Amino acid sequence: MSKDEIIDILDLIIESIHLVQERFSRIRVPDDFVLAQEGVTLLDAISMRLQVIGESVKRIEKTDLSLLQRYADIEWDKIARFRDLVSHHYEHVDHEIVYDICETHIPKLREVIQKMRTAISESYEL
């Protein structure tokens, strides 16, 4: 995979994170996802963007696993597994887990993805 292709994937992840954070800003507690139709709609929309993030991570993993290994503080395998859950067993998606992902893990992921993109843009050669 070329440097430009990886940057495009990272840009897609950054865009998805932005949308997740924008949508999640309307959620105060986990049950906000299930107590009203708007919350259910937000849960669906956020879950789909988490799926996009997971699919993008899997694409990088297939072609340049060493890139992900350089940023070992992110649990890349869990991101990929959550993508699989959303894709193949959506009925088992737990709103409390989605809340935790958005509240706890997405801000750190955004920071790391932006660092990766900067590093690749400046010096990374495949």
What function would you assign to each model-found segment?
Residues 1-126:
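Solvent-exposed interaction patches of small proteins and small membrane subunits
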